[in-house]
């Protein structure tokens, strides 16, 4: 019976006593911040959960690649149009569920509807840029049952803890090159420089996880896309389309011309070149060989795991410097404790105890079958 090693077993395992990359990163940045978040399990109190464009687009990518995996295993594959429709439907469903589970004032609803509209616009653009036909989804096996390597929950042995667990967005094989990439989707306001990928400990850990699962990968691909939709060009008073350079694509500009009853050919020569350097997405590749991954694991991850274990039994230091503290979600408690204020009152007023993520069988099921 085929069985992929190191897959998290939801029926037999819980994250209790395990560590995650986010936990280790929190500890390495400030052990007091880690204590607030992982010992006290505090998270800022909010009126309602926050649904972002990034979360909705991530759902869309998950469904798209599930369709791609299903296409690999059937004689009647879905067309790209059907795949896109399925993904947009899943985005709609997530948004509708969010709206049903939370209370909104009437005047707040248009903002939420605009967010959905923007998310679908961003995702549809990303769908065409990603090119799902380029990749094959790697198949893993759980108790002999084939599963796509998508939203893959793993747990690998990690000294100092009961294991390190995490979720891999996708493991994809490039059909042209044969390279296999541990893939992470990022929808963000601004694209990060490629140079930062060398310091991405999350992706290095995911490489180690793939190695322990017995999956040979070439490296990691962080596929990042802006989370703002392409801008619509302005129709001038004389009925012509503005030729100003804006943050949009030529394809979107041409579509706006058609909607306005204009011929895109009249604008193509000038505008196609003018808009060519607008960057909406970038795949960032990092080729990590196994020796590099081992060194990162042994020199950074394992020591942090041991330090986390020890930190449960001691008073943790505060890493006080502006860049760290101004971005910290626990700064109000930290400052209250340092100044002798009523920190417990702030805990009760501004924070709640976090509920840990529980992955259900429905989460791991092929959502395409439900569409």
Predicted region positions:
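RecB-family 4Fe-4S metal-dependent nuclease core
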Residues: 1-371
């Amino acid at each position: 019976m085929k069985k992929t090693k190191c897959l998290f077993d939801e029926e037999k395992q819980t994250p209790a006593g395990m560590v995650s990359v986010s936990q280790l990163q929190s500890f390495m940045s400030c052990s007091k911040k880690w204590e607030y978040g992982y010992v006290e399990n505090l998270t800022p109190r909010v009126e309602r959960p926050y649904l972002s464009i990034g979360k909705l687009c991530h759902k869309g990518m998950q469904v798209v690649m599930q369709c791609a995996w299903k296409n690999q295993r059937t004689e009647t594959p879905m067309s790209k149009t059907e795949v896109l429709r399925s993904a947009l439907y899943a985005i709609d469903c997530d948004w509708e569920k969010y709206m049903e589970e939370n209370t909104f004032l009437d005047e707040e609803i248009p903002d939420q509807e605009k967010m959905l509209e923007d998310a679908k616009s961003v995702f549809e653009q990303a769908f065409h840029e990603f090119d799902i036909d380029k990749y094959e989804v790697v198949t893993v096996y759980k108790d002999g049952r084939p599963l796509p390597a998508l939203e893959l929950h793993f747990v690998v042995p990690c000294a100092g803890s009961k294991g390190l667990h995490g979720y891999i967005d996708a493991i994809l094989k490039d059909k042209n090159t044969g390279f296999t990439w541990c893939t992470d989707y990022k929808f963000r306001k601004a694209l990060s420089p490629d140079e930062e990928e060398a310091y991405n400990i999350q992706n290095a850990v995911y490489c180690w996880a793939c190695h322990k699962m017995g999956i040979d990968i070439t490296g990691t691909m962080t596929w990042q896309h802006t989370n703002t939709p392409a801008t619509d060009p302005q129709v001038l008073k004389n009925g012509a389309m503005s030729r100003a350079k804006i943050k949009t694509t030529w394809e979107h500009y041409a579509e706006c011309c058609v909607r306005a009853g204009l011929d895109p050919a009249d604008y193509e020569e000038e505008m196609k070149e003018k808009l060519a350097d607008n960057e909406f997405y970038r795949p960032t590749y990092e080729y990590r060989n196994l020796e590099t991954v081992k060194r990162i694991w042994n020199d950074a991850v394992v020591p942090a795991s041991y330090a986390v274990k020890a930190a449960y039994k001691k008073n943790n230091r505060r890493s006080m410097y502006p860049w760290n503290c101004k971005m910290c979600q626990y700064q109000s408690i930290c400052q209250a404790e340092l100044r002798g204020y009523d920190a417990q009152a702030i805990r009760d007023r501004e924070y709640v105890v976090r509920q840990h993520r529980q992955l259900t069988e429905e989460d791991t099921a092929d959502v395409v079958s439900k569409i």
